[in-house]
Swiss-Prot record:
Domain RRM per the UniProt entry, residue ranges: 675-751
Modified residues (N6-acetyllysine): K77, K144, K182, K252, K269, K276, K319, K345, K411, K450, K756, K777
Gene3D superfamilies recorded: 3.30.70.330
Amino acid composition bias (Basic and acidic residues), ranges on this chain: 217-235, 401-412
Renumbered residue ranges of the record's region Interaction with PPARG: 291-337
Motif LXXLL motif boundaries: 142-146
Record's compositionally biased regions (Low complexity): 578-597
Residue(s) carrying Phosphoserine: S538
Protein name, UniProt field: Peroxisome proliferator-activated receptor gamma coactivator 1-alpha
Segments for region (Mediates interaction with RNF34): 348-796
Positions with biased composition (Polar residues): 114-127, 242-258, 332-344, 413-428, 439-450
Function: Transcriptional coactivator for steroid receptors and nuclear receptors. Greatly increases the transcriptional activity of PPARG and thyroid hormone receptor on the uncoupling protein promoter. Can regulate key mitochondrial genes that contribute to the program of adaptive thermogenesis. Plays an essential role in metabolic reprogramming in response to dietary availability through coordination of the expression of a wide array of genes involved in glucose and fatty acid metabolism.
Length: 796
């Protein structure tokens, strides 16, 4: 540990000297000039140290090209060793332990995972292409630091130089708490991986973009236990964070104002790390840091005012979004990312982050194709960057990761997600504006809603989308899961329509919009299914005869206009047949015809009125109730209905004529039997009931009628059941006259007999008289004879 403290003091002293002399000068002019005043000789490995110095003098020409990067290289390796030592201390006894082999294997694993790439043939090559020599003896710590590739420290060196003042101020804090040093670990590892990708002069960014946009399959080379071990290391490392991590990030600049490799006589012209390339690379890294660079700032443009400063609520981790160069490095970077988080848990440490952290790499490459930008500009600490799932990526091991992550989260209480964090990154990428507009509107800066626990989120996801290992993601499922991954409350998701799963629409959902028409799985078949329409069963709740005439929603009309028109015609025909005025079940009285017809028109009109109110599209087809006629699908059906109506009309007329003839025969029979009495000169205000009551004293009356004339004379006919009663009324009827009335006229058979065209011959000698035997004299005369006879009669 004393050796580590000595190296840290030496590094910071050299950085301070470089800041005083100028940033254009090399930060470390020569390795033997390191400040070793505080070095403890007892803890120093003399052979390894001198061997390293001897190798350094032999390779002076190669080392001179990278002296400006050597302090940061040593600083990074010491950080990694301290990180490994801290891991061993925290996992075993939480006591200080000397440096032994426990830390070096993890150091080797991290180094191999971060440096090794699939696109590079020799990862440890120098900028000029000469590989460093390998020694057969046991490599010491300093040898490991010196043998590390030099091009892995380019992006970190200048950032350390620009932030020298902050590191000098906090030197004592770094010395007392070595765990803080690992804050720079994930950042420098990420910078090292990206710097090694950019070997050509103008091609590095294009090749990097090409590699980032390749949507490869989820890695299967690493076993699952590798991820579990990385997750265990992250659990131990995240306990050692302090507040100085945030202060260190606040002192970081957003972009570089000077090139990372200043021109010097030792710098070859053919070096692949030119100014513009390195600036762009570091801009990618710094813009990936959450909240430090505004989303609209170009990668190569320096931002001086730095309006987006880090806050204690923001998470400095951005490692999960920047695509690593290889599948092997992806796991180690993910483990280091979770280890560099603060003690307060955020959404990236939640259960959903464990599920979605593996898919963010492919998602970022997919978004790069949409944005058409030369560099990656995503924020890794925001949920919407991590929650977008690719269609082709379905991780089978998600359930195991969720289970392990839930066990880890039970140790620490999750903290609330700051609403400002969502708003500060809403505009980070234009492709996200459409998908997160509703989420940003619903979350206000002063929102105090209770955040969902991870178990509740997992329960909601399993409820609506099934188990994660068996889920099939589509566009609609991705949007819904994006909402559920944003750590909102239960009330937010309870507003989602529940007819998505059932395929049926609730009341009032199709009143103003037609975008949910695809939810109706069952076609319109005329069945009485109230849940399919925009009117509930309340339409038929008050004894309406048009209960099954509820109109379907507007979307069904737009999808099947012809079929609905045919259904409407057949339905109208059915209604007209059942409510026809010539129904056989109607009463035989003549007045029932008009009442039935008016009832039919009322009911059909009410039905059409309800249909018109519930479905505006029916208004063009509906006519007035009295002018609308039933429609028929075929001419044969029309002929059949017409013949039925004609047949019914003939039968009705026949029955009516038979009734009239029967009444006439009964009247004639009553007249012949002398049971009909004619009563004349009655008052004009006399009613039939009054006349019947007054003459009923003589006997039982079958029929009584009163007729009024225009001249004011009134008369009536009374038909008795028996003839004797009629005679008694004819003889004693005058006794019923009142004082203010005239005498009644009482006759048999009534006056109607006097208006007959054939009268009976009252001559008693009619049988003896034969008109044929009597012949007139004028019958035998012609015209001339008759004329002469007339003239003679005139002379007389």
């Amino acid at each position: 540990m004393a050796w580590d403290m000595c190296n840290q003091d030496s590094v910071w002293s050299d950085i301070e000297c470089a800041a005083l002399v100028g940033e254009d000068q090399p930060l470390c002019p020569d390795l033997p000039e390191l400040d070793l005043s505080e070095l403890d000789v007892n803890d120093l490995d003399t052979d390894s140290f001198l061997g390293g110095l001897k190798w350094c003098s032999d390779q002076s020409e190669i080392i001179s090209n990278q002296y400006n990067n050597e302090p940061s290289n040593i600083f990074e390796k010491i950080d990694e060793e301290n990180e490994a030592n801290l891991l061993a201390v925290l996992t075993e006894t939480l006591d200080s332990l000397p440096v032994d082999e426990d830390g070096l294997p993890s150091f080797d694993a991290l180094t191999d995972g971060d440096v090794t790439t699939e696109n590079e043939a020799s990862p440890s090559s120098m900028p000029d292409g000469t590989p460093p020599p390998q020694e057969a003896e046991e490599p010491s710590l300093l040898k490991k630091l010196l043998l590390a590739p030099a091009n892995t420290q380019l992006s970190y060196n200048e950032c350390s130089g620009l932030s020298t003042q902050n590191h000098a101020n906090h030197n004592h804090r770094i010395r007392t708490n070595p765990a803080v040093v690992k804050t720079e670990n994930s950042w420098s590892n990420k910078a090292k991986s990206i710097c090694q990708q950019q070997k050509p002069q103008r091609r590095p960014c294009s090749e990097l973009l090409k590699y980032l946009t390749t949507n490869d399959d989820p890695p299967h080379t690493k076993p699952t236990e590798n991820r579990n071990s990385s997750r265990d290391k992250c659990t131990s490392k995240k306990k050692a964070h302090t507040q100085s991590q945030t202060q260190h990030l606040q002192a970081k600049p957003t972009t570089l104002s000077l090139p990372l490799t200043p021109e010097s006589p030792n710098d070859p012209k053919g070096s692949p790390f030119e100014n513009k390339t390195i600036e762009r690379t570091l801009s990618v890294e710094l813009s990936g840091t959450a909240g430090l660079t505004p989303p609209t700032t170009p990668p190569h443009k320096a931002n001086q005012d730095n309006p987006f400063r880090a806050s204690p609520k923001l998470k400095p981790s951005c490692k999960t979004v920047v695509p690593p160069p290889s599948k092997k490095a992806r796991y180690s970077e993910s483990s280091c990312t979770q280890g560099s988080n603060s003690t307060k848990k955020g959404p990236e440490q939640s259960e959903l982050y464990a599920q979605l952290s593996k898919t963010s790499v492919l998602t970022s490459g997919h978004e790069e194709r949409k944005a058409k930008r030369p560099s990656l500009r995503l924020f890794g600490d925001h949920d919407y960057c991590q929650s977008i799932n690719s269609k082709t990526e379905i991780l089978v091991s998600t359930s195991q990761e969720l289970h392990d992550s839930r066990q880890l989260e039970n140790k620490d209480a999750p903290s609330s997600n700051g609403p400002g964090q969502i708003h500060s990154s809403t505009d980070s990428d234009p492709c996200y504006l459409r998908e997160t507009a509703e989420v940003s509107r619903q979350v206000s800066p002063g929102s105090t809603r209770k955040q969902l626990q991870d178990q509740e989120i997992r329960a909601e996801l399993n409820k609506h989308f099934g188990h994660p290992s068996q889920a099939v993601f589509d566009d609609k499922a991705d949007k819904t899961s994006e909402l559920r991954d944003s750590d909102f409350s239960n009330e937010q998701f309870s507003k989602l329509p529940m007819f998505i799963n059932s395929g049926l629409a609730m009341d009032g959902l199709f009143d103003d919009s037609e975008d949910e028409s695809d939810k109706l799985n069952s076609p319109w078949d005329g069945t009485q299914s109230y849940s399919l329409f925009d009117v509930s069963p309340s339409c038929s709740s008050f004894n309406s005869p048009c209960r099954d005439s509820v109109s379907p929603p507007k979307s069904l009309f737009s999808q099947r206009p012809q079929r609905m028109r045919s259904r409407s015609r057949s339905f109208s025909r059915h209604r007209s047949c059942s409510r026809s005025p010539y129904s056989r079940s109607r009463s035989r009285s003549p007045g029932s015809r008009s009442s039935s017809r008016s009832c039919y028109y009322y009911e059909s009109g009410h039905c059409r009125h309800r249909t018109h109110r519930n479905s505006p599209l029916c208004a063009s087809r509906s006519r007035s109730p009295h002018s609308r006629r039933p429609r028929y699908d075929s001419y044969e059906e029309y002929q059949h209905e017409r013949l039925k109506r004609e047949e019914y009309r003939r039968e009705y007329e026949k029955r009516e004529s038979e009734r009239a003839k029967q009444r006439e025969r009964q009247r004639q029979k009553a007249i012949e039997e002398r049971r009909v009495i004619y009563v004349g000169k009655i008052r004009p205000d006399t009613t039939r009931t009054e006349l019947r009551d007054r003459f009923e004293v003589f006997g039982e009356i079958e029929e009584c009628t009163v007729n009024l004339r225009d001249d004011g004379d009134s008369y009536g006919f009374i038909t008795y059941r028996y003839t004797c009663d009629a005679f008694a009324a004819l003889e004693n009827g005058y006794t019923l006259r009142r004082s203010n009335e005239t005498d009644f006229e009482l006759y048999f058979c009534g006056r109607k007999q006097f208006f007959k065209s054939n009268y009976a011959d009252l001559d008693s000698n009619s049988d003896d008289f034969d008109p044929a035997c009597i012949k007139s004299k004028y019958d035998s005369l012609d015209f001339d004879s008759l004329l002469k006879e007339a003239q003679r009669s005139l002379r007389r």
